[in-house]
Amino acid sequence: MPDWLSALLITLLKAVLVALALLTAFAYMTLIERRLLGRIQLRPGPNRVGPMGLLQPLADAIKSIFKEDVTVTLADKLVYTLAPILAIGMALTAFGGIPAGPPGSLFGTDPWVYNLDAGILALLALTSMGVYGIFLGGWASGSKYPMLGSLRSSAQMISYELGMGLSVLGLLMLVGSTNFLDIVEWQAGPRGHGWLILFQVFAFALFMVSSFAEVNRTPFDLPEAEQELVAGYLTEYSSIKWALFQMAEYVNIMTASALMSTLFFGGYRGPTFLEPLIPGISSWPLVWLIAKIAFFMFLFIWVRATLPRLRYDQLMRLGWKLTLPLALVNTLVVAAVLAFVPAEGLFGIPRLWLLGAVSLLLLLILFAASDAVRGLWNSPALRNEEKRVPGRPLGGD
């Protein structure tokens, strides 16, 4: 067998395994989310199907498959059908670029589907393409509520994609690479400097807020706001097409969790301070990556259970007036520290720890000025009554 063919078959096999793992995780994440929401809301949650409700995802899958697939009369049939496929396809493709271990650690092969030098840039591009599925689904439904939901999703993606990209720019300047393996090894490899959360906590806060907005989760779930848009872009979808959109949303949550774990918490590398207790524990790549992803997925569920939904005007102001300028400030601060502070640091403080202190100070200033900052995105725009043109009275002349 030619080398190129064997490499292609191995890549396809890894892609299938990643897809199966993600879809299985999606099924049980829905169960875990419903059980956790039940505990938070002082109710049991789903616990009837199978032992302790463990077969509930199977029951949900059977129900979705055998429900009637209703198609709207005015829908563009081809685009209406392709939209959920595009959404789940982009979500699965994006996750394939996250490394689950060092090279050759998966039965002698590399534990990723693809590895690009511009890894973080490619992944951000793929995640932003997922909004095409949402927009096309809303547009092709031939109804006003899905159209409004898809327009909201497009505006939301544009607003927070810029802040997300700028928030990691400082991190990339520190590491000097956009490759995920280089980022992980810079943090926790043999010559690791420490997790980037220690030096870029301000950037992490901005990235986390942008991630919540990118995956359309509470408090940023405006595209499918039930009280305003029935179900948003999902209004005219049912059966397996609706399930595909739900899969895409949860896979995007897993991708965002894996991104935060890889960029700021060492990815597949564990903490080295546990080595004296359990030798080799920091070198369990898959275990540590899954544990970190699970923590952030729990955070998504916790936020959904506790925070209310923002208004649409608040959402846009938060993205353009707060997240984007602060991400730009963080980028300029990192550039200034790297340009003007010597590598050995100042006053006996290493440059990295000095940058970490500045980043923490920026976050504390933001919290201290929270009341003033909230006014940037919470207060509605007021009309100038003096310049207001009087309207024509109702009922004619």
From Swiss-Prot:
Subcellular location: Cell membrane
GO CC, alphabetical: plasma membrane
Keywords: Cell membrane, Membrane, NAD, Quinone, Translocase, Transmembrane, Transmembrane helix, Ubiquinone
Chief subcellular location: membrane
Record carries keyword Signal: no
E.C. no: 7.1.1.-
Mode of membrane association: Multi-pass membrane protein
A Pfam family per the record: NADHdh
Single GO MF annotation: quinone binding
TM annotation in the entry: 7-27, 78-98, 120-140, 164-184, 195-215, 247-267, 283-303, 322-342, 353-373
InterPro entries recorded: NADH_UbQ_OxRdtase_su1/FPO (IPR001694), NADH_UbQ_OxRdtase_su1_CS (IPR018086)
PROSITE patterns for the chain: COMPLEX1_ND1_1 (PS00667), COMPLEX1_ND1_2 (PS00668)
Reaction catalysis annotation: a quinone + NADH + 5 H(+)(in) = a quinol + NAD(+) + 4 H(+)(out)
GO biological process per UniProt: aerobic respiration
Record's function text: NDH-1 shuttles electrons from NADH, via FMN and iron-sulfur (Fe-S) centers, to quinones in the respiratory chain. The immediate electron acceptor for the enzyme in this species is believed to be ubiquinone. Couples the redox reaction to proton translocation (for every two electrons transferred, four hydrogen ions are translocated across the cytoplasmic membrane), and thus conserves the redox energy in a proton gradient. This subunit may bind ubiquinone.
Family: Belongs to the complex I subunit 1 family.
Subunit structure: NDH-1 is composed of 15 different subunits. Subunits NuoA, H, J, K, L, M, N constitute the membrane sector of the complex.
Name the record gives this protein: NADH-quinone oxidoreductase subunit H
Species, as recorded: Deinococcus radiodurans (strain ATCC 13939 / DSM 20539 / JCM 16871 / CCUG 27074 / LMG 4051 / NBRC 15346 / NCIMB 9279 / VKM B-1422 / R1)
Gene name of this polypeptide: nuoH
